[in-house]
Amino acid sequence: MGERPCILAIDQGTTSSRAIVFDAAASVLAVAQTEFPQHYPADGWVEHDPEDIWRSTLEVSRQALQAAEAKGARVVAIGVTNQRETTLIWDRRTGRPIHNAIVWQDRRTAADCAALAADGNETMVQARSGLLLDPYFSATKAAWLLDHVSGARMRAENGHLAFGTVDSFLLWRLTGGRVHATDATNASRTNLFNIHTQDWDPELLRLFRVPAALLPEVKDSADSFGQTDPALFGRPLPVLGLVGDQQGATIGQCCFEPGTIKSTYGTGCFVVVNTGATPVPSRHRLLTTIAYRIDGRTDYALEGSIFIAGAAVQWLRDGLGIVRTAAETEALAAGLPDNGGVYMVPAFTGLGAPHWDAAARGTLTGLTRASGRAHLARAALEASCYQTCDLLAAMREDGATPAALRVDGGMVANGWMVQFLADLLDLPVDRPVVMETTALGAAYLAGRKAGLYGDFAEFTRVWRRDRRFDPAMPTSTRTALLAGWQDAVRRTRSGAPD
């Protein structure tokens, strides 16, 4: 029997790096994962050491590759998916970053964004990039690096530095510094890319003061991105797919038709609805973004971004020490008859969509002497569901009419949370058999380019549902819970009275 052709999917996330090998039937053959440190040098600042990103990625890739090939598989291509917006600048000659990566959650440029908005720039920025003026995106992060690292701006203007999101940095390292490129989905998250012309926008570059010489080439999501340095894996492997993590999950959930919608629950939560070949401007402060670009065809999406989802549970574990594992929260939440009036608004780094309040900070409301660790665990889980409900309401106002929501990410292993989500949304929620949908999306792109996977219709037949969660909550209960949540959000907003 010959070796089975497979795809290595690299999933470089906010708190961990993962590598997963998929076969031609989109089944998982091998998985490797490792966490890496987070750095918080100041209030609202979040950084990663780029060498931690690279070392952890290389480590898990080698582990998964070795495990799969021990089972008779042969990896024929690599697909990469990544935490988006996180910004790096490195020296083209040495490959060394000039500073830690500034993570998507980082809010250090909030005042810069506010100043640009006060000068009347947000309408132009949104019209061209589909995004709002917010420190979430890469442009002001890049400008901050150029302004705060000694000599960086001059080196950038002289063509000695390279900018990239995490995919671009990994591609540079994987190819031994031979390829400086990104894909359209990652480019569309920078505030520098025109989603209509499909190119870097000169007016946006001027506004954010980012030299064009810094920027990578923008390619399709399924494309030839060069070959890996043979020293890394013992032989060169073609990199045939790049995609931002939420777009990767959109592909992995087979949301190829307009109106299909998915929500991913990892460090943050991201709801994405496919809008087809036409970009739909949001009237409710959602993001108009690129879902994927394949064979020159672009499909667009509306996205709502929640900065803190699973990270709230991680805080309960690592910050407060009230749970040993994230899995404990399910039994704690289920053991309560109700939430006891306790709400957590986890605005640790501000509020994302639809509020976009960079100055908001987290709150716990409704605490009494009867409140215990179970109430905190339940409040952390419920918070992701309430925020999803806010996003779905905005999407419906913008014309989306979802029949069901497909969910993925580490949090959705928690059946209690997914049922609460269905109840709160009053909408069926589908959980897939293959939970690694982000990595699966990257694998599909590389596998499609390699000839291992077929078109959208063929790949859609591979998707299988593990369980459907149907809503069962009385309307009166839902209404009361949502009213309590909205009151908690009002107390959290930066303009709220003391």
UniProtKB/Swiss-Prot annotation:
UniProt: ATP binding residues: 14-16, 267, 310, 314, 410
Which keywords does the record carry?
A: ATP-binding, Glycerol metabolism, Kinase, Nucleotide-binding, Transferase
Q: In which pathway does it act?
A: Polyol metabolism; glycerol degradation via glycerol kinase pathway; sn-glycerol 3-phosphate from glycerol: step 1/1
Q: Which reaction does it catalyse?
A: glycerol + ATP = sn-glycerol 3-phosphate + ADP + H(+)
Gene3D superfamilies (UniProt xref): 3.30.420.40
* PROSITE patterns hit by this protein: FGGY_KINASES_2
Where is sn-glycerol 3-phosphate annotated to bind?
A: 14, 84-85, 136, 245
* Binding positions (ADP): 14, 18, 267, 310, 410, 414
A Pfam family found in this protein is FGGY_C
The membrane spanning regions, by residue number, are none
Question: What is a biological process (GO) this protein takes part in?
Answer: glycerol metabolic process
First and last residue of the signal peptide: none
Any single GO CC term annotated in Swiss-Prot or TrEMBL for this entry: cytosol
Provide the activity regulation entry from the record.
Inhibited by fructose 1,6-bisphosphate (FBP).
Entry EC no(s): 2.7.1.30
Amino acids binding glycerol? 84-85, 136, 245-246
| Function description | Key enzyme in the regulation of glycerol uptake and metabolism. Catalyzes the phosphorylation of glycerol to yield sn-glycerol 3-phosphate.
- The protein's name: Glycerol kinase
Gene it is expressed from: glpK
